[in-house]
């Protein structure tokens, strides 16, 4: 939430147990918000993510980032849950990043939808990685070495939107030069 507050974008917090978060009104459910939602960032225990994704579908959210872990990276049971979430997002035609990711940063749009410790300097390099830990480390180093980025994507488990789609987007949109990516083995 702290990263979003810096972006000066309109944000809504959703938490069924708190009426305020960082001094802002918190809604019990995304359905209670009387506005269109461009992006939902889900950071809750894995066992309730599917219900929240279904709420996002009913709300006609345009995109979803799931930072929560506890899915395919944990074994067969987690993979089954991840597949159910993917099916829901696919059927609703809602792009889904994650789960198990750090999030995204678009410095050209002034958006930090991640759990990175701080927003890096704006530059020309796009950074993509499955590993949120690697991105976190590179953001730390970039601050020390005065390096900048245009966009940063941690795509996690790639249950729906994957590395090849991000590479194609960056290539077609000519949004960055060069593109750096770490591929898992």
Label each PLM-derived region with a short phrase.
Residues 1-185:
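Catalytic-core regions of core metabolic enzymes
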């Amino acid at each position: 939430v702290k990263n979003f507050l810096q972006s000066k974008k309109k944000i809504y917090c959703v938490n069924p147990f708190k009426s305020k978060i960082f001094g802002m009104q918190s809604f019990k459910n995304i359905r209670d918000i009387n506005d269109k939602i461009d992006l939902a960032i889900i950071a809750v225990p894995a066992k309730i993510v599917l219900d929240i994704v279904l709420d996002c579908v009913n709300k006609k959210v345009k995109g979803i980032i799931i930072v929560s872990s506890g899915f395919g990276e944990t074994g067969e049971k987690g993979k089954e849950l991840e597949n159910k979430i993917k099916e829901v997002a696919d059927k609703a035609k809602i792009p889904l990043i994650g789960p198990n990711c750090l999030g995204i940063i678009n410095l050209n749009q002034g958006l930090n939808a991640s759990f990175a410790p701080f927003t890096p300097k704006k530059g020309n390099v796009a950074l993509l990685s499955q590993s949120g830990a690697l991105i976190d480390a590179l953001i730390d180093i970039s601050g020390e070495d005065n390096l900048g980025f245009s966009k940063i994507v941690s795509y996690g488990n790639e249950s729906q939107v994957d590395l090849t789609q991000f590479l194609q987007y960056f290539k077609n949109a000519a949004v960055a030069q060069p593109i750096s990516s770490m591929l898992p083995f």
